Regions:
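N-terminal alpha/beta PP-like core and its mobile active-site loop of ThDP/TPP-dependent enzymes
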Residues: 1-145
Length: 145
């Protein structure tokens, strides 16, 4: 059976021992949330009131548990709202992975609704633009931590 991008993300999170993720749902990550529901016996999702809170919660969780903090946000303002929490974790060498959505590949560079190049805002990001690159990128991040 061929897995889609959301299923690949969930499988790798479980494989890497992730049992808790923080986030705030939005249009471009709804497929991830659909899959997380199917994994709710293995991954607990903590819903926050704002993406920035989710980012700081993932940072705090990583500091308190020694595990990698994982945060999920949608495209555009959802992803930019993660920046302060990501920067805090980065500056203190706290292991954290952010999963964000984006507009469809065909819409990139066309000033689409909620299109933001988050990689340009966060220099320590390894962006993924296709399902085939998701496993490599996630394994790279988890191997760093």
């Amino acid at each position: 059976m061929q897995l889609n991008g959301s299923q690949i993300i969930a499988e790798i999170l479980v494989e890497q021992g992730v049992d808790t993720v923080f986030g705030y749902p939005g249009g471009t990550v709804l497929n991830i949330y659909d899959v997380l529901y199917d994994y709710s016996d293995r991954i607990t999702h903590i819903l926050t009131a704002h993406e920035q809170g989710a980012s700081h919660a993932a940072d705090g969780y990583a500091r308190a548990t020694g595990k990698t903090g994982v945060v999920i946000a949608t495209s555009g303002p959802g992803s930019t709202n993660l920046v302060t929490g990501l920067a805090t974790a980065y500056m203190d060498s706290v292991p954290m992975v952010a999963v964000t959505g984006n507009v469809s590949t065909a819409q990139i560079g066309k000033d689409s609704f909620q299109e933001v190049f988050i990689g340009g805002i966060t220099m320590s990001v390894i962006p993924s633009t296709s399902c085939t690159s998701i496993p490599v990128i996630l394994f790279t991040w988890f191997s760093i931590y």
